[in-house]
């Protein structure tokens, strides 16, 4: 019997009359583009934020389409709050835009599943930062805070500027600089982050994600920011 794979739909659109062109996220192969045959009864099954399981026949060519079939429903993670839904859409959009095809992504896949199950209005900012850090690691652009760009250990008593290649020690106070004590928290569990740590780490992941995007725009990020700004008025 052929192996069944768990996966999530990142993006889908209609392809001919009875098929969907999909981008899916898997543990074993990372991101895959493929085709799923559908009918009127099953078409609503293939939506983002739903965990599915099925057989996958990988494309023989790098630019080809895989075939996904014998798909079954596992679990739905549709959230009952708008902020949670936007947060999950943000994760999907990041994976869709940034993740390479056909690379095993066990750690990122497990983090993604954990966040789908546990995100709420209280912890969503923390979990999104955790996801961004894991995604950057998967992209080979991880945030390393052991040393600055000059090879010196990060000092919790100093402040640093964020560069594309790391962190540079500031000789004087500079706007948007990051305290060394907050940078060092990146290596610690999210449960140990303070609100101050979160704000600092958010600046770091924003800078690194923007660098990885190379000018690509995130629709979900804009919606998320606009929604949060409405709450401040």
Swiss-Prot record:
Keywords: DNA damage, DNA recombination, DNA repair. InterPro entries: DNA_rep/recomb_RecO_N (IPR022572), NA-bd_OB-fold (IPR012340), RecO (IPR003717), RecO_C (IPR042242). It holds the Pfam family RecO_N. The keyword DNA damage applies. The keyword Protein biosynthesis does not apply. One of its GO terms (cellular component) is bacterial nucleoid. One of its GO terms (biological process) is double-strand break repair. Disulfide bonds: none annotated. Involved in DNA repair and RecF pathway recombination. Belongs to the RecO family. This is DNA repair protein RecO. It comes from Francisella philomiragia subsp. philomiragia (strain ATCC 25017 / CCUG 19701 / FSC 153 / O#319-036). The gene is recO.
């Amino acid at each position: 019997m052929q192996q069944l794979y768990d996966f999530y739909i990142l993006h889908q659109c209609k392809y001919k009359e009875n098929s969907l062109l999909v981008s899916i996220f898997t543990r074993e192969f990372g991101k895959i583009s493929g085709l799923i045959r559908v009918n009127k009864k099953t078409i609503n099954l293939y939506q983002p934020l739903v965990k599915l399981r099925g057989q996958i026949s990988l494309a023989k060519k790098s630019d080809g389409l895989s075939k996904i079939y014998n798909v079954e429903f596992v679990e739905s993670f549709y959230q009952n709050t708008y902020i949670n839904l936007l947060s999950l859409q943000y994760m999907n959009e990041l994976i869709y835009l940034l993740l390479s095809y056909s690379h095993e992504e066990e750690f990122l896949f497990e983090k993604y599943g954990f966040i789908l199950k546990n995100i709420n209005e209280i912890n969503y900012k923390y979990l999104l930062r955790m996801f961004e850090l894991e995604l950057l690691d998967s992209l080979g652009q991880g945030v390393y805070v052991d040393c600055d760009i000059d090879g010196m250990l990060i000092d919790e008593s100093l402040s640093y500027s964020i560069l594309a290649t790391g962190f540079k020690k500031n000789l004087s106070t500079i706007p948007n600089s990051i305290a060394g004590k907050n940078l060092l928290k990146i290596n610690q569990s999210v449960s140990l982050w303070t609100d101050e740590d979160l704000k600092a780490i958010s600046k770091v992941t924003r800078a690194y994600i923007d660098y990885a995007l190379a000018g690509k725009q995130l629709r979900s990020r804009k919606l998320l920011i606009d929604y949060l700004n409405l709450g401040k008025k």
